[in-house]
Each structure stands twice: as C-alpha cells, then as structure tokens.
C-alpha cells in the first residue's frame, strides 16, 4: 500500500510539473479573467476583445505543447513495447513466466508512460476549459454587438419617422 502511495505521488508530482510548465500562460490568463469577473462584475468591450484574442493565442501555443507531450507519450510506448518484446524473446520458461518477466522489466517505462499520459490528459482538460471560456467570451461579445445593432436600428428608425 505504501509503495502504491509513493509511486502514485511521484507520478502526480512529475505530471503536475509538466502541466504547470505547459499551461502556465493559460492558467495565468484564466486567473486574470476570473478575478475580473469576480471583482468588477462586468468586463469592458476592450478587455473582452483583448481576452478573446489573448486566449485564442494562448490556446494555440498550449495545444502545441500538448502535442509535444503526445509525442513523448508515443515514444515512451514504443520504447516500452520494444523492451517488453526483447525481454520476452530473451526469457526462458512458460508463456506466463515470459509475460511476468517482461512486465517486471518494463515497470519503469510503464510509470514514465503513465506520467506522460496523465500530463497529456490534464493539459487537454485545461485546454477544453480554455475553449469553453473562449466560446463564452465570444457569446458575450456577440450579445453586446447585437444589442448595439438593435439600439442603432431603433435610433435610425426613430429618426426616419420624425
């Protein structure tokens, strides 16, 4: 049990380190938006435009970082499979014994694979939340534009009738 706790804590710490590194800009921007919403209540049009542009840009670079994690995950899978197969080939005994030896030989690679896999999933979750925020900001902007257009059409329409 203690071994599981230690290993899982190690996986969590290292994957969190990757996530912090790759998502720092996105996390910082999401915190700024949250603080503005909590403190000011309403974001100005200029701030809204800036956040839409900044968030789209940040998501682009975070997506690139996520793909780098995916590449590392794929590479780790290949290395693990290669070691597993080599150990299986070189082992003597029954199929069950060969499988057990191969699994034992690839424990470290499996842990590294889990680290990259968890980090990839965590970055993806943050990116998904970032896209949700971006879509929400766009909806707010579109609503404001519609309200302005409606107001202008009433004003212009009112002038024609006078």
Q: Can you name each region flagged by the protein language model?
A:
Residues 1-5, 153-162:
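Short acidic DE-rich linear segments
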Residues 1-43:
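Extended, charged low-complexity scaffolding/tethering segments
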Residues 22, 28-29, 129-150, 158-162:
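Long, highly charged low-complexity segments enriched in Glu/Asp and Lys/Arg with interspersed Ser/Thr
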Residues 31-61:
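Short, charge-rich amphipathic alpha-helices with coiled-coil/heptad character
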Residues 46, 65, 72-75:
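Amphipathic alpha-helical interface segments
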Residues 58, 62-66, 70, 106-127:
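Amphipathic alpha-helical coiled-coil segments
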Residues 70-115:
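Extended, amphipathic alpha-helical coiled-coil scaffold segments used for oligomerization/tethering
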Residues 77-82, 112-144:
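Long amphipathic alpha-helical coiled-coil segments
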